[in-house]
Amino acid sequence: MSLIYFASGDSHANIEYQTISSTATEANQEQSERLHDRISKAQLQRLYERFKSAPDQVVGCADFRRMLEEVDIVFSDFTYTRLFLKINQNHDFLVDWNEFVSYLIFGFQEEDPSSQKESLIMPISAAPVVRKTEHRSAVCCITLLKVKSDQTPLEDMTESANYSFGGEDSPENSGMWVTASHEGQLRFWSAHMEPLRSAVSESIYCMSYAFYNNGKTHSKLVLGDYAGNVRILSYSPYLRGPFQAKPGAALVELTWADVLRGRIPLLIPKEYINLHNELISCVYYSLHMNALFASAEYRNTKKYRGRCPGLIMVSNDDRNNFRIPLGVSVFYVSEVKNILVTGGPDTFVRIWDVYISSEPSAILTGHNGGIVAVFVQPEENKVYSVDYHKIIKVWDLQEHTLLQTYGELVRIIHHSEMDIKYYYHSHLRELMVAGRKLIQVKCCPRVRVDLTDGNTHAAPVSVVLYNRLFRNIVTCGLDSYIIVWDPWTGRRKIIMKNCHTKMIYGETIDIEITAACFDPLEQFLLTGARDGSLKIWNYNNSVVVRNMSIQMDQEVTAVIWVVDRILAMGWDRQVTEFNDVEGREYGDPKKWAKFHTDDITCADVKLGEGVVTATYSGEIIFWKLETGQPYRRYNVMDPSQFIELKLTAEEEKLSRRSKRISSLLGANRRSASMLAIKPDEIKDYGANIPVSVQAVLFLQKRPMTKDHGSVFISLDTGIIQVYSHHQHGGHIKEFIAVHKVGDCVLTMATDRKNRFLYTGTAFGYIKIWHIVNYCIPEAEKTHVCMPKLRLDFIFLRKELFLTRAKRMVRNQPEPMLVSSYKGHLKAINSIGFINLPKILFSGSHDYSCRLWTQSGRYLGTLGTVLPWSKLSPFERAGEENRPYRLPPDIKKVASSTTLKVISGVQHSFQVKRPKPTEEREDEGEVEDTGTEMKNIFDRPLREPILGKHFELPGRSAIEQRIELDTTQLYVPIYSHLRVHPSDVMENLPTPPIIGQVKSENYLDHYMPVVGKVDPNTSAINIREPNKVIRSKAGGQVGQARASSTWGKPKTNSILGMPRAESSQGKARASSAKAGVSSGYGRTNFGPNPSRVRSNSPKVSFMPSQLKTCRKPESSPRKAKTSPARAKSVSFPAKANPVSTSAKANPTCTSVKTNPVPTSAKASRVSTSAKSNPVSTSANAKPDIMPVKIKPVVKKPSRNTAPVQITTSIAKTKKDKP
């Protein structure tokens, strides 16, 4: 949307330019032109006589000023001109008596406090909350277990009744709901209708309870019965009366006769016998008026003949009878307003003065059934009534008019349910409806100021304008409201509802307002709606002056009002011109040439020079304002290319066809524009995908030359392009105006001298750009005082690190970004600037219009319930040194930059750097001097400084370890852990010394041992080489055999121990592929394991658990197991593993044991620490598959640990055991 601020005219130039001129001094503007505070009744009478004696009873500008001076009312030239324009509503520069009196009346109406409390939305606008009652039968009674009394003392009444700070809906503040059903069941609910507990009790028919929170007077318990009697029990709230806790008595039962006899001395009884002749329908005791109210229904009209006392008010010994036909079913007493609202079977709602019982002050009609519930909101001046058909009506308490009819309960509650109970919670402003269901209806809920500052409109704000003549702000919204605000006091002056409407099937539908502007003298308001309608308003008296329309169901996106002409454009893709000359207003409008191929999104005007329009497809056309002829055409995708202003016959035909298709199918206007262009013609417009234009702005102070950038074009890509509207000008520069992906500028404004550019983005950011030296010739550029800008804009001050907004423009010298902050949660649709007080205002899609200082301080939201800041139209806002608050909704999502700009506080960050030695010595001397002075003149405070106080316990220094329960088969949490496979480790190159001993046989260095091996010794005798007895054929007793091939039998070892075939313990060590190491507790054995006899514990391996593989070419071999017990097999730490190669068959079986330490008595086979490592390579095939085998341990010792055996089996066919 475009904001048009201009003033022009060819007649009465003195009045126009003296009023709207930007050269008026501040001294001339300080005097208020308001006449209401300076005129008296005698002066008004003398003015009336002057008007009657004037020719034709009208006076001109000079004559009217003379008349005011004759009655001692003197104004300056500037102030009087403003006053005359306000009075002259007919726009003829002549004033009569009716215009003068109308101006005075409207001024006094603006000061009426009742106009401030008119609601923007319906009293009941939120959806009701429905839930089950959890009772077996329908609810017969509903009440509130109160914590706070409804009867608030008058001295405690404040002006903050319409807003809350949160937390009021807790049970401690709002109490609990209590429901009862016919089966005697009680249920307690929270304020949010969450069940708390239930109980069983006997039902009670009619009861009322009155109390004060501070306990100033006795509490009253009022009882009404079927016979028309009323009884009152009074007791002190401090002594709790009958509710005292007595030991051993959980329930106290007594009769009324016992109470009268004084069985409970704390109770003060009082009774009114036969107060009514019928059943008591409702009772209430007012502590403020010290009066009892009791009502009854008198349905027997023949018996009472309409003279029944429907309601009786008893105060001391005085009785006031409110006689109502058919009696009273329900009533409500408002002690703040001193009124009484009654409702009965006659379908009428009556409003009474509590002290006048002769006749009601008002009778509200409109219900079609008997009234079953009434209540009053004195803060909102509203009366609510509910009839038998479950219809809720809302009435204005002062005007006695109907505001709303709410029939949603009819849809929710079944038609067979008629006995419905109602209760109004005055603290939460909620109406509770109980039957088979529980329904919660919010009635004018309070504003939560901890969440929001309030709303300006009931729908998104579309246009915000500032009127320099009346010095007020006008807001237009999508709710079809026009509201006039006084920005200096924050009050709402005028509200106009249902401004644009249309009739659909007999129902009046509101139409959204999408564009607005003022006339050149800023006396009238022009608005455009989504259905193509235009209206001219005299918004001071809410009168429509003229109705117009561009085209049916074509949205108006921009309106321009210049002298004698009105321009409107929108989805009809052309400019429509209306006459504003007296006598020719109602002629046919003029249609400009249709050169656009898509919907027009925005437009702006340069007075006396030209108009610019832009479309969704990125087309920009410059028009002559005098003739309406286009002279330049561009496309934002290729701004340097000039497009010829000529439509071919084929292009016109396609444009008409696309328009006809879009109107029939209801397609979007953006898609319709693409249908009108052939694929081969897209290249003429710059790109395949069109980029839409969101806003345009003319800089009024820049001349029309080809070197001056006078038009700013905002694109949906976040870029702002600058053009010259000269005939030989064009695209000059462009810059990025956002710092987030997907954001774009939706509205732009500037100050009076075009020094700053104010932009509002789709993400709710407000940015201010310094454009004094941007896109102008070098000779006209001026010096920029950066220290002054840093004083005005805290955003420019340095920080430790660059924020997002600064990082985006760090390589962009011009224009300079001087401020950036988040002002709204949603898109900003309109923005404007007030020059003298330096106030920036923004209207957003979040229903609010907010005021800011130029430096970014938050002033307030129009329509807020909080106190307003003191502002003046003649003083700059934000000069006083006081803390500024943040909007509650922005405070929760604000970045560090937004917090700094809005609050105006920058935290100081100091980087500590090492200082030279001399500086540190000087500082040490200064500190020593200060310490001496402190010891002489000052004493430190004694400990503890705080005296006796509670100290928080310190944090525990003990590390809290997590212990997992491993007694089960598995821990479930492990199944959720992501385990990454380990990488294959590369083998290190074999050292040369190891390669030399590969061919050596380590058995050549050992001496055969005769007899048993002593396990207590760790060394093995090594014989000399010339005494070695070697046998290649087989094994002899007492000889050690070494074999490294598959074909030689009896050369294997189990668990890394040499095989002993005889009692003499002939040792033999053999290894297959991998080495034996004590560090890993791992041994490898060949395919033919044999038995091992030793002193270690026996370990048996089952045939089904220990599997071996055979060589495919050889005969099958079965694995043998040994009953030998082996607790652990290890070597000394300094001994290296010994391995031999198996050349015949690569298939092997490996045994893996846990490295559990054993006792000294356990048998182990070890090598000497001094033995040299000997290893041989094994030519093994790569297809080896590991298989885990669980051993069976027989008779383990106490320290025996389970042994895990891993076998590596080749992928060949297994033999059966």
Swiss-Prot record:
SUPFAM superfamilies: EF-hand, Soluble quinoprotein glucose dehydrogenase, WD40 repeat-like. Residues 910-929, 1033-1217 are annotated as: Disordered. Keywords: Repeat, WD repeat. InterPro entries: EF-hand-dom_pair (IPR011992), Quinoprot_gluc/sorb_DH_b-prop (IPR011041), WD-EF-hand_domain (IPR051242), WD40/YVTN_repeat-like_dom_sf (IPR015943), WD40_repeat_dom_sf (IPR036322), WD40_rpt (IPR001680). It holds the Pfam family WD40. Residues 919-929 have a biased composition (Acidic residues). It comes from the Eukaryota. Residues 1041-1054, 1085-1107, 1137-1179, 1198-1210 have a biased composition (Polar residues). Disulfide bonds: none annotated. Residues 1181-1190 have a biased composition (Low complexity). WD repeats lie at residues 155-199, 323-362, 366-405, 456-495, 508-547, 595-635, 740-779, 823-862. PANTHER family: EF-HAND CALCIUM BINDING DOMAIN 8, WD40 REPEAT DOMAIN 95. This is WD repeat-containing protein on Y chromosome. The lineage of its organism: Eukaryota, Metazoa, Ecdysozoa, Arthropoda, Hexapoda.
